[in-house]
Amino acid sequence: MLELTGLTAGYHGGTVLHGLDLSVSAGTVHAVVGHNGAGKTTLVHTVAGLISPSSGSVRLDGREVTGQPAHRIARAGIGLVPQGRRVFAGLTVDEHLRLSYRPPRRGDKDRPSVWTPARVTELLPRLGERRGNRGADLSGGEQQMLALARALLGSPRVLLL
């Protein structure tokens, strides 16, 4: 379960999230909608660890992740597919997948890794066909698929899109 308690955050000196409380149960899908500047991206970036909240907490399965660096939050089980295209132009699709793959570690018994580079390219066959291509050579849609694949390879419990 993802739990946000009293989350307050903002950007450019302004606050857009004011004491937000939210619980997201396992196996559910939620959407956040609102006008420009309402705080949708700030919310996602705060949960993913890209922005530190000014107050409140983010917990994943009861474990505090507030204020941790994004790579630790990803390891804790929160994956992010960025809004814009986020691929490294000089890396091939294969290199992106290897870079993002996180095999299970000892103690990860509760997180079996069902997402492997082979499994991802099986589910997203267009990526499999382009494994040798550089990020700069991919179409916008292919870059977005690659961003999704990279997020899945962390075997996240929560996936932020």
Where are these regions (language model features)?
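The feature captures the beta-strand-to-loop junction immediately N-terminal to the Walker
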Residues: 33-35
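Conserved ABC ATPase signature
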Residues: 134-138, 142
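Helix-to-loop junction immediately C-terminal to a conserved catalytic motif
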Residues: 48
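Conserved structural motif at the start of ABC-family nucleotide-binding domains
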Residues: 2, 17-19
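ABC ATPase NBD coupling module
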Residues: 52, 64-85, 109-113, 117, ...
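Conserved catalytic motifs of ABC-family nucleotide-binding domains
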Residues: 155
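ABC-type ATPase nucleotide-binding domains, specifically the catalytic core motifs of the NBD
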Residues: 12, 68, 93-115, 125
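ABC ATPase C-loop
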Residues: 151-152
